């Protein structure tokens, strides 16, 4: 091969190595910082949550979910940062495999949830009922439930009768809340003054007799129907979750290939020079990074 063509190929190889290296460093660092932020928010929320009597179910504790998500993002991204800086093949492979496993597990989880849709809905409804039992004791769940009921115009998990699981809303309970639902279940115009007593004495009545007063459909089905009607938003959310992980796997795989090519090139060069000979190719730098040779 003419010397000019050889130098051009070498320059392209060097450029691709550096481009992949810095792209992977930026990718890992961004998600490392995001993981640290999510973890910090989760820890702060959990500290605040512990000041009050709260839910025992980790599924319904947003702070616990944030902490777990933050820990996973922080640790995995840290491996990616360290691997890309050191050009360590073992760490790079570990980073790629972890991302790939997470991606596959998410896809499998989605397929299982769709395949066993009825069981998934029952699982969600059961957890919502457990949350309703502690509605007035857990501010996190209360705020989430109130928001969902107002936003999606629904009441309870399966339907409005789920509120009988709460000790204050049970029909046998003393007090004005008995046999009623929270005011966020009520049908009202935005211009009207909020009537916090609008949902009283509705649980023990039939759907048709209260459907003009409160929302009778459950929030689980309401949210599912909303996502089906707004499939573009759902597709955007799925892409936002899955695409970065896929790009991370692809980027790491390409970078591993380039690092292996460099190692192979150096091995061949050293073998041709013979034992004890000084190679003419010198490293461009040392330290935290394995730099591409000049």
Curated annotation (Swiss-Prot):
The keyword Disulfide bond applies. The keyword Glycoprotein applies. Residues 1-23, 84-93, 257-294 are cytoplasmic. GO terms for biological process: negative regulation of Notch signaling pathway; protein localization to plasma membrane; protein maturation; regulation of membrane protein ectodomain proteolysis. Its main location: membrane. It is a multi-pass membrane protein. Signal peptide: none annotated. Keywords: Cell membrane, Disulfide bond, Endosome, Glycoprotein, Membrane, Transmembrane, Transmembrane helix. Disulfide bonds join 154-219, 155-185, 171-179, 186-198. GO terms for cellular component: cell junction; cell surface; cytosol; endoplasmic reticulum lumen; intracellular membrane-bounded organelle; late endosome membrane; nuclear body; plasma membrane. Part of TspanC8 subgroup, composed of 6 members that interact with the transmembrane metalloprotease ADAM10. This interaction is required for ADAM10 exit from the endoplasmic reticulum and for enzymatic maturation and trafficking to the cell surface as well as substrate specificity. Different TspanC8/ADAM10 complexes have distinct substrates. Promotes ADAM10-mediated cleavage of CDH2. Negatively regulates ligand-induced Notch activity probably by regulating ADAM10 activity. Residues 45-62, 115-235 are extracellular. InterPro entries: Tetraspanin/Peripherin, Tetraspanin_animals, Tetraspanin_EC2_sf. Interacts with ADAM10; the interaction influences ADAM10 substrate specificity, endocytosis and turnover. This is Tetraspanin-15. Belongs to the tetraspanin (TM4SF) family. SUPFAM superfamilies: Tetraspanin (SSF48652). It comes from Homo sapiens (Human). Glycans are attached at residues 118, 189, 230. One of its GO terms (molecular function) is enzyme binding. It is found in: Cell membrane; Late endosome membrane. The chain crosses the membrane at residues 24-44, 63-83, 94-114, 236-256. CDD domains: penumbra_like_LEL (cd03158). Palmitoylated.
């Amino acid at each position: 091969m003419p010397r000019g063509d050889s130098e051009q190929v070498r320059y392209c190889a060097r450029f691709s190595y550096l481009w992949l290296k810095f792209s992977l460093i930026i990718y890992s660092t961004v998600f490392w910082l995001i993981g640290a932020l999510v973890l910090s928010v989760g820890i702060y929320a959990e500290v605040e949550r512990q000041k009050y009597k709260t839910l025992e179910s980790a599924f319904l504790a947003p702070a616990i979910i944030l902490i777990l998500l933050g820990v996973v993002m922080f640790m995995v991204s840290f491996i990616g940062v360290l691997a890309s800086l050191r050009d360590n093949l073992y760490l790079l492979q570990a980073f790629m495999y972890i991302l790939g496993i997470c991606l596959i597990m998410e896809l499998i989880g989605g397929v299982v949830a769709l395949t066993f849709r009825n069981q998934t809905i029952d699982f969600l409804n059961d957890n919502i009922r457990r949350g309703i039992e502690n509605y007035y004791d857990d501010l996190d769940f209360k705020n989430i439930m109130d928001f969902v009921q107002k936003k999606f115009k629904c009441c309870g998990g399966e339907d409005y009768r789920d509120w009988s699981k709460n000790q204050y809303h049970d029909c046998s309970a003393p007090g004005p809340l008995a046999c009623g639902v929270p005011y966020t279940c009520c049908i009202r115009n935005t211009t009207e003054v909020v009537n916090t007593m609008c949902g009283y004495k509705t649980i023990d009545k039939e759907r048709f007799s209260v459907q003009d007063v409160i929302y009778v459909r459950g929030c689980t089905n309401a949210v599912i129907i909303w996502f089906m009607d707004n499939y573009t938003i759902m597709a955007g959310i799925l892409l936002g979750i899955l695409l970065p992980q896929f790009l991370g796997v692809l980027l790491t795989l390409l970078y591993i290939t380039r690092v292996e090519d460099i190692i192979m090139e150096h091995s061949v060069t050293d073998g041709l020079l013979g034992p004890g000979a000084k190679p003419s190719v010198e490293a461009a730098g040392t330290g935290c990074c394995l730099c591409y040779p000049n």
